[in-house]
UniProtKB/Swiss-Prot annotation:
Pfam families: Mpv17_PMP22
Main localization of the protein described in the UniProt heading: membrane
Top-level taxon in the UniProt lineage: Eukaryota
UniProt topology in membrane: Multi-pass membrane protein
Residue intervals on the Cytoplasmic side: 1-30, 98-115
Protein's organism: Bos taurus
This protein's name: Peroxisomal membrane protein 2
Gene: PXMP2
InterPro entries registered for this protein in UniProt: Mpv17_PMP22 (IPR007248)
Length: 196
């Protein structure tokens, strides 16, 4: 029986290493939820920026091993660790308190809260922090906000609204930051594939 079960696990791709990694992640998530989400956000944000750079270089037919901007993934790691993970953790918990699932139309109300309050505030914070991490002055921040905020927010609303509907209504609260980070990883790659 054991060899058959072992073979079935191997065929399903659920070997002992992924199983242990998942078990460890869940344990850390239970013991240190904010730190675990912060670390996960930092790693996935950096990976997303790195992947975006590789895609851009490949599209331009450049050598992918040369001239990678290591400061980009570092900035995204800092932003993910100190902002995305912790803020996402507390926002989703507060959302559960403010709009319990028993409230009529809770899913729609949560989505509106996320899209109309959290998304614009979080996008503004992103522009501010990235501006600071890039060593830019307040004039550069104001220029980025003026030229880039509304287009970025409109694109955010178009792309992330269905994602957040699923996240808020169907993903357990402890996994919402991870789900959003995994989608963001592909979002960065998609933007890079468009040459943005």
């Amino acid at each position: 029986m054991a060899p058959a079960a072992s073979k079935l696990r191997a065929e399903a791709g659920l070997g002992p290493l992924p199983r242990r990694a998942l078990s460890q992640y869940l344990r850390l998530l239970r013991l240190y939820p904010v730190l675990t989400k912060a670390a996960t956000s930092g790693i996935l944000s950096a990976l997303g920026n790195f992947l975006a750079q590789l895609i851009e270089k490949k599209q331009k037919k450049e050598n992918c091993s040369q001239k990678l901007d290591v400061s980009g993934p570092l900035r995204y790691a800092i932003y993910g660790f100190f902002f995305t993970g912790p803020l996402g953790h507390f926002f989703y918990l507060l959302m559960e308190r403010w709009i319990p699932s028993e409230v009529p139309l809770a899913g729609i109300k949560r989505l509106l809260l996320d899209r109309l309050l959290f998304a614009p505030a979080f996008l503004s914070l992103f522009f501010l922090v990235m501006n600071f991490l890039e060593g830019q002055d307040t004039a550069a921040f104001a220029a980025k906000m003026k030229s880039g905020f509304w287009p970025a927010l409109r694109m955010n609303w178009r792309v992330w609204t269905p994602v957040q509907f699923i996240n808020i209504n169907y993903i357990p609260v402890q996994f919402r930051v991870l789900f959003a980070n995994l989608v963001a990883l592909f979002w960065y790659a998609y933007l890079a594939s468009l040459g943005k």
